[in-house]
C-alpha cells in the first residue's frame, strides 16, 4: 500500500513538474511573440531508436521532449549544445525555421564527420532545408508521403496537431561498420519506407562541394 501511494505521489509530482515546465516555456515564448513548439511523435522516435540501437544523447532536448525521447543523456539547461561536443547515437529534432534548423544540421554533420558521434537521426519540419542545405543529399533521407502530425504539450498531456509544413528525416549511419555488422542503411530504409520515400543515390556519401567545384570549373550549358 505504501509503495502504491509513493508511486502515485511520484506520478503527481512528475505531472506538476511537467505543467510548471510547460507554463514557464509558454510564458517565455509569449514574451517573444512565439508559439508553443511542436514535438515529434513516439512512432518516429522509436523507429530511430531501432535503427541506431539506442538514443544516447538528444542535444535539442527540453523537459517536455525528454518525456517522448527518453534519451540516455540530455544537456543541462545552461549548456549551449551548438558549442559543445556530443557523443554516441544522437537524436536531433530542432525547433524553428530554416535558419535554426540549418545551424543544427551543420553542427550535427560536423560532430558526425569528426567522429564525436557514432550515428544520428535528424528530424526537421523546415522542408525548405532540402534546398538550403545541399549536404542533406550526401546521406539517406526520408521524405514522408504525408505531413507528420506532431504533438503539442498541454496540461492534460499531448494533443496531435496538423502541421502546415512538410518534414524530413536524415540518417547518418556508423562510419566504422564491419562486414559482420547489420547493414544500417538498409535497416533505415526498412524502418521508414512505410512513412515516406527513402532517397539514397550512388554518389551519396561524397562531399556535395565536389560537385559544386566541378560545376564552377565546367559551367555546363543549359
Q: What residues fall within each predicted segment?
A:
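Class I S-adenosyl-L-methionine-dependent methyltransferase catalytic core
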Residues: 2-222
Amino acid at each position: 500500500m505504501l509503495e502504491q501511494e509513493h508511486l502515485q505521489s511520484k506520478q503527481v509530482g512528475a505531472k506538476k513538474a511537467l505543467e510548471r515546465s510547460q507554463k514557464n516555456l509558454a510564458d517565455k515564448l509569449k514574451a517573444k511573440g512565439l508559439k508553443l513548439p511542436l514535438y515529434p511523435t513516439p512512432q518516429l522516435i522509436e523507429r530511430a531508436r531501432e535503427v541506431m540501437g539506442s538514443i544516447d544523447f538528444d542535444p535539442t532536448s527540453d523537459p517536455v521532449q525528454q518525456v517522448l525521447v527518453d534519451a540516455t543523456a540530455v544537456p543541462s539547461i545552461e549548456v549551449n549544445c551548438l558549442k559543445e561536443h556530443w557523443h554516441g547515437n544522437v537524436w536531433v529534432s530542432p525547433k524553428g525555421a530554416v535558419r535554426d534548423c540549418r545551424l543544427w544540421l551543420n553542427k550535427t554533420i560536423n560532430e558526425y564527420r569528426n567522429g564525436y558521434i557514432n550515428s544520428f537521426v535528424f528530424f526537421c519540419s523546415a522542408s525548405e532545408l532540402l534546398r538550403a542545405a545541399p549536404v542533406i543529399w550526401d546521406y539517406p533521407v526520408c521524405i514522408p508521403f504525408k505531413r507528420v502530425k506532431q504533438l503539442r504539450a498541454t496540461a492534460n498531456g499531448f494533443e496531435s496537431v496538423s502541421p502546415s509544413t512538410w518534414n524530413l528525416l536524415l540518417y547518418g549511419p556508423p562510419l566504422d561498420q564491419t562486414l559482420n555488422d547489420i547493414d544500417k542503411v538498409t535497416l533505415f530504409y526498412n524502418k521508414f519506407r512505410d512513412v515516406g520515400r527513402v532517397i539514397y543515390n550512388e554518389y551519396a556519401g561524397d562531399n556535395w562541394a565536389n560537385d559544386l567545384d566541378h560545376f564552377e570549373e565546367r559551367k555546363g550549358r543549359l
